[in-house]
Amino acid sequence: GVVLAVRELHAWGYLKSFPTLVAVQAANCAPLATSFSQHSEHVLDVLTKPTIAEGIASARPARGAQILAEMRALDGRFVTVGEQDILAARSALASRGSYVELTSAANYAGWLKYKETYVHEADRSVVFPLCGAGLKSAH
């Protein structure tokens, strides 16, 4: 979805260049991030554990090979976030008036991790989705 949107915005002239795409996965279930870091063209079988970010918990993501290829073609990045990072991100967002569900909180945690990991890119403008009410989760 995001790749298609970025490609269309570029084709229509709304983007002069492609932005850096950052994909976030929970550390407990990160087959794409693992496959990407190991330069695999296909999603590798990885050991996964349950994660509180249920919306991104997929050991065999649909179109995984396509996602890996698109992220490479667009010079994308992957980051993984731990369960405590996700909970802390949701608390931080809630303190600012946005009570989101945990999968969305993983996006914010991913942005924080991205800033730590790619310090030289930390001052860039970012867009990340925050959707889903926090009342959806028992955590």
Predicted features along the sequence, with ranges:
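Short, glycine/acidic-enriched capping/hinge loops at junctions between secondary-structure elements
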Residues: 1, 33-34, 138-139
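Phosphate- and divalent-cation-binding pockets in alpha/beta enzyme and binding domains
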Residues: 1, 31, 89, 109-110
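Active-site/ligand-binding loops adjacent to catalytic centers
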Residues: 8-18, 22-102
